[in-house]
Amino acid sequence: MLQARIRVTLKSGILDPQGVTVAHAMDSLGFRHPDNCRMGKYIELSYPEDSEPASLHEELRKVCERLLVNPNTETYSLSLVRIAADGTETVLEGSGR
């Protein structure tokens, strides 16, 4: 199986109100207050083993840029991983913006 792993985060300098809320909640609950807390999205998409990695990666890059990511406020990283039957993982492609 091929698995796409996409991580979407706010660009540095963009206010992250959800991250601020989590940091304050941690403090209120008695946990150590972090210096910084940034929230984001994590997406996994699975494809058949016989998918061609280079064309799949290019298609997924377009999915990120046209559907999943707001280029004004967010950035992303994209990894394409082959997962063998025994669970062994091999990173095939990686990129981001």
Per-region residue spans from a language model:
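Non-catalytic terminal accessory/regulatory regions of metabolic enzymes
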Residues: M1-R97
